[in-house]
């Protein structure tokens, strides 16, 4: 019992320390050296890179379909992160899905794959936080990460803890960017 508590305290202390040093929260730092060879597409993003309003706060508020290919053969699980790197608080994370099975190649709108879990977003709620750009178009990034292990996190994990675990386990990634008009 004491060992488990000590491990939790050590892990959380590390996360707090890294957060204070600016190492967690910066997609650039987390992705340094990770190959960008996964292809990411969405039927819900136009060829011009515009995501339909159905996936924003003034629409249905569900997430769009995301498809990917070319994950490495040694992938143990996958994660999808949606963020806005230009938000006043960066990165603002709208959605994290993790422990997606390695054979899975898509997420359908409103349907999380069996066995996958969602973390909290930057707003503090579990699941997808639909974007709501106030006065100008924003660019959102859907990044698919191939992970070398499954994450040992519960559903509803803290956004920084989930982001840190994904960054540490990432072996490859791919990205789709989408604009949402106000």
Question: Model features per residue range: what roles?
Answer:
Residues 2, 8, 17, 21-182:
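N-terminus-centered regions that define maturation/targeting leaders and the start
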């Amino acid at each position: 019992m004491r060992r488990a508590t000590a491990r939790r305290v050590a892990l959380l202390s590390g996360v707090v320390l890294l957060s204070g040093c600016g190492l967690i929260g910066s997609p650039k730092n987390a992705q340094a050296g990770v190959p960008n060879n996964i292809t990411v597409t969405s039927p819900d993003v136009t060829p011009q890179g515009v995501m339909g309003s159905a996936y924003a706060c003034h629409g249905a508020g569900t997430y769009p379909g995301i498809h990917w290919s070319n994950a490495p053969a040694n992938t143990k699980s996958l994660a999808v992160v949606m963020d806005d790197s230009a938000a006043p608080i960066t990165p603002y994370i709208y959605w994290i899905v993790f422990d997606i099975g390695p054979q899975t190649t898509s997420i359908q709108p409103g349907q999380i794959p069996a066995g996958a879990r969602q973390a909290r977003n930057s707003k503090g709620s579990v699941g997808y936080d639909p974007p709501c750009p106030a006065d100008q178009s924003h660019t959102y990034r859907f990044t698919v990460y191939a992970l070398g292990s499954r994450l040992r996190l519960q559903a509803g994990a803290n956004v920084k803890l989930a982001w840190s675990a994904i960054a540490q386990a990432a072996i490859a990634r791919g990205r789709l960017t989408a604009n949402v008009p106000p």
